[in-house]
């Protein structure tokens, strides 16, 4: 037997769907574009005809009618190697994807670290291509937030920008974790276990997370009467290699350190390697606490005590806020800050 679909030449059209459903072309168009100005009976007939014919809407034509692309962008200001190699980014993408499922929005992912990548991204971030934008791993001098706002696109940031950590800065649309509180809890844990010379490997100081975690470390050290001099602070870019190098610096400057709070699990894994190479026992000689509670924390030797941030929940919240902005809604708060907790394992 030959099915109706196989007899239809080429791609099914709106008119063919209307004929099959026994309704007008306008009714089909309203169903396809999500209008509620259609009776339940007519909607059911149209949806049945669409399924039988295998009709796929012309997205370009639909966009002209709805002024929507049904796509959103996630732009990460990091290299492709880091985005696909580090657990944090994978968790964020999983969370965003799950948050967009019910909204039927397609996710467009791009990296924007090099000048060429940034130029391509800038050409794509228009209302003709996407309905909204999420930006992640922003550095202080990144021009993308201002560009997106100037183009009138709904925008949500992953992480509090560095400028918003300064006194008097106004809040924006963002999702973050309690970085200051998490760092304080890490130092509290080290102090409670008898550590008195607590060093830190801080993140980049042109990023909100890097600034906040260092501030939390310093506040907790002051509260416990611990030293926070420059010799106890080294810096890294959240990578494994940076953790290796920063731990070497700390051991050279202050061989008497008995603990270290590290602003990211990958850097903490690098620090553990350097400590082992230096003959330091962990945690007997030096205790180590990381930040993230990524899969890396369970794979290190010894396993890593760390501050847990709910990465996938952060991605889902980013998607929720962006959907609200696209719909023109005004939530009670334009930002979300998620709690952090210390997960105790062998390294501290």
Give the ranges of each region predicted by the language model:
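Flexible loop/turn connectors
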Residues: 7, 248, 252-348
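Periplasmic-binding protein-like
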Residues: 130-136, 199-201, 233, 254-264, ...
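Short beta-strand segments enriched in small/hydrophobic residues
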Residues: 27-29, 67-81, 189, 197-204
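Alpha-helical recognition/docking segments in bacterial nutrient-uptake
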Residues: 1-9, 71-75, 79-188, 256
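Short acidic/polar active-site loop segments enriched in Thr and Asp
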Residues: 24, 70, 131, 195-197, ...
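Hinge/beta->alpha junction and helix N-cap segments in small-molecule ligand-binding domains
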Residues: 78-91, 109-117, 174-185, 201-248, ...
């Amino acid at each position: 037997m030959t099915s109706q679909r196989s007899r239809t030449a080429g791609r099914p059209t709106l008119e063919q769907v209307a004929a099959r459903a026994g309704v007008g072309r306008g009714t089909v168009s309203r169903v396809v574009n999500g209008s509620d100005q259609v009776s339940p009976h007519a909607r059911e007939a149209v949806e049945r005809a669409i399924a039988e014919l295998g009709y796929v809407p012309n997205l370009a034509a639909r966009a002209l009618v709805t002024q929507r692309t049904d796509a959103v962008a996630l732009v990460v200001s990091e290299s492709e190697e880091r985005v696909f190699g580090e657990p944090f980014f994978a968790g964020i993408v999983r969370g965003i994807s799950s948050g967009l499922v019910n909204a039927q929005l397609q996710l467009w992912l791009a990296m924007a670290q090099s000048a060429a990548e940034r130029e391509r991204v800038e050409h794509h971030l228009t209302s003709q291509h996407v309905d909204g934008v999420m930006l992640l791993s922003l550095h202080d001098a990144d021009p993308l937030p201002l560009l997106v706002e100037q183009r009138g696109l709904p925008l949500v940031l992953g992480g509090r920008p560095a400028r918003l950590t300064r006194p008097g800065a106004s809040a924006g649309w963002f999702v973050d974790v309690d970085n200051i509180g998490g760092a304080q809890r890490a130092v509290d844990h080290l102090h409670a276990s008898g550590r008195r010379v607590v060093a830190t490997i801080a993140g980049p100081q042109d990023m909100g997370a890097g600034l906040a975690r260092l501030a939390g470390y310093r506040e907790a050290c002051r509260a416990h009467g611990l030293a926070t001099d420059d010799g106890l602070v080294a810096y890294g870019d959240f990578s494994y290699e940076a953790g290796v190098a920063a731990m070497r610096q700390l051991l050279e400057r202050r061989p008497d350190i008995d603990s270290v709070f590290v602003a990211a699990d990958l850097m903490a894994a690098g620090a553990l390697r350097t400590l082992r190479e230096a003959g330091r026992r962990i945690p007997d000689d030096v205790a180590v606490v990381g930040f993230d509670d990524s899969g890396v924390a369970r794979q290190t030797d010894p396993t890593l005590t760390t501050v847990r941030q709910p990465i996938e929940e952060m991605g889902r919240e980013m998607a929720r806020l962006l959907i609200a902005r696209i719909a023109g809604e005004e939530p009670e708060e334009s930002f979300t800050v998620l709690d952090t907790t210390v997960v105790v394992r062998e390294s501290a």
